[in-house]
Amino acid sequence: MLTGQNGILNRASEAKEKTEIASKDEQRKLAQAEALMNTGKTTYKGLILPEGFAPTKIEGEDSIDDGLVITDGYGNEYVWVEVPRTSEVYPTATVNITEFNNDAYINIENDLHTYTSLYRNNTSYTDTYAEDDTSGWFKDESEYNEAKQKMLKSVYENEGFWVGRYEAGISELRGGAGEITAIPVSKENMYPYTYVTRTQAEVLAEKVESGSCTSSLMFGVQWDLVLKYIENKKEEKIPEISKRLNEDSEYIGNYWNSKIKLNRGKYVEYKAGILGNLWNDYTTDIKGCVENQQKVNTEGTGIFITTGASESTNLQNIYDMAGNVWEWTIENSEMNQEKCVYRGGAFDSYSRNRPVSFRYYLPNNHLYYSVGFRVAIY
């Protein structure tokens, strides 16, 4: 029998897949070793890499069109988000700014808002300072604006920025509020780093090693730029990609109504508004929840997954932007006492109501099991 489940062809296919995985693992280890030796900034394919990073050079991860991946010496991976410095993107700011004064920054920001207008959805939310007396937040408007202008200048000059390939992760599951001493990682098969407030997430993001570059939560415009980059690179292969990003993210994220396939990692069942406490290997079946590594679309039932557990959520080598956990940004909702903003929906969200472009506002003390974050480097 050649084509049966235990047939020669199936075994050959499985062997080939295992060989390819092993080969990629070896390439990752080599890239990590190279990263440890890169004590200064390096250049690769026209991009400036932070100190301590190297490209993985793995097929499918080695071009801006696919999503170029870099790693540090410990396996933390980031993806380049291209923002071309062209007259189409910067019609007002222009492409040859020599003096970065206040007017220049205003023009850059406004042009980027126009460039990403589909994903702003006429929002009134802005990247402006919101007062917060929580320890670790920007002390005043001047400090916030300085950080924003640093980001805008870097995006303009370098034509993009690095974003965490994965949601910020942690090796041991957080079961509630508590100390946040563990530095977040950007690796697959980690528990999403949840039960953190917006300010706690920013403090953690700033602690991530990024050489002489800056690590931070994303500003609102950066989140929109990630979506625009995905749209630009995917629109030929997925003509409806902008609708999936902006109207209904069912097929690109982990929502309760999604039917994602699990490829690795672990999951925990969410049913009737209750999150379970038993994390299962991705190959484990739970009737009406996950069967044959496929999430079953049962109303009111979902799964919370470890980082990068499903290729269904992979867009340009960036995992889980849509669904799984909400992700804090440092945008301002302008909503009285609820000025903190998170994006993208979660495993307990409905995809049409909470697509990846969706914004929502919360108070500065909000933390929850379905709220996490992602780190950007620029």
Give the ranges of each region predicted by the language model.
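Short aromatic-cysteine micro-motif
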Residues: 74-75, 103-320
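Short, solvent-exposed loop/turn elements at domain surfaces
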Residues: 87-96, 170-176, 336-338, 350-353
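Active-site-proximal beta-strands of protease catalytic cores
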Residues: 322-331
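Alpha-helix exit/C-cap motif
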Residues: 3-6, 22-41, 231-236
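Disulfide-stabilized, aromatic/cysteine-rich ligand-recognition loop
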Residues: 196, 203, 214, 307, ...
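Acidic glycine-/aspartate-rich tracts in secreted/extracellular proteins
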Residues: 84-88, 167-170, 330-336, 347-348, ...
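C-terminal juxtamembrane segment of a hydrophobic transmembrane alpha-helix
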Residues: 1-13
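GGW-centered surface loops in extracellular recognition modules
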Residues: 40-91, 215
